[in-house]
């Protein structure tokens, strides 16, 4: 339960574990239910194109997401995969929505074991592939 009184629905944990352990999904989008009491799964996808993920982020509302982010490391290290947690809170979202999402984030984040990076996005430049790549690849060899 978060400071805002919002709980994490079991389906959210199940979807996350399906992404993390079962590699069933490439990304999962989470949001609040209609009465803003629970964090639920809004959508799951196995689409590998990062741009498809970005298109799912609303221009005028908040959401959370986890993405199985794959990238290459130069040299012999090859491909890496890291699970990234996104808090999407665009400047154009309603203030009330931003407040509830901000105060509920920790409950979801603590429930998702195995996330390696957190990205806070208020505009698309902050969640662009290159921006995320720079953050997740720090300390993982040169890129």
UniProtKB/Swiss-Prot annotation:
Pfam families in alphabetical order: Cofilin_ADF (PF00241)
CDD domains membership: ADF_cofilin_like (cd11286)
Molecular functions per Gene Ontology: actin filament binding
GO cellular component: actin cortical patch; actin cytoskeleton; cytoplasm; nuclear matrix
SMART domains from the UniProt entry: ADF
Broad class of the protein's primary localization: cytoplasm
Organism domain of life: Eukaryota
Protein's GO biological process: actin filament depolymerization; actin filament severing; cell division; endocytosis; Golgi to plasma membrane protein transport
InterPro entries from the UniProt entry: ADF-H (IPR002108), ADF-H/Gelsolin-like_dom_sf (IPR029006), ADF/Cofilin (IPR017904)
Signal peptide positions on this chain: none
PROSITE patterns according to UniProt: ADF_H (PS51263)
Alphabetic keyword roster: Actin-binding, Cell cycle, Cell division, Cytoplasm, Cytoskeleton, Nucleus
Compartments where found: Cytoplasm; Cytoplasm, Cytoskeleton; Nucleus matrix
Residues annotated as domain ADF-H: 5-137
Protein family per UniProt: Belongs to the actin-binding proteins ADF family.
Described function: Controls reversibly actin polymerization and depolymerization in a pH-sensitive manner. It has the ability to bind G- and F-actin in a 1:1 ratio of cofilin to actin. Binding to F-actin is regulated by tropomyosin. It is the major component of intranuclear and cytoplasmic actin rods. Required for accumulation of actin at the cell division site via depolymerizing actin at the cell ends. In association with myosin II has a role in the assembly of the contractile ring via severing actin filaments. Involved in the maintenance of the contractile ring once formed.
Protein name: Cofilin
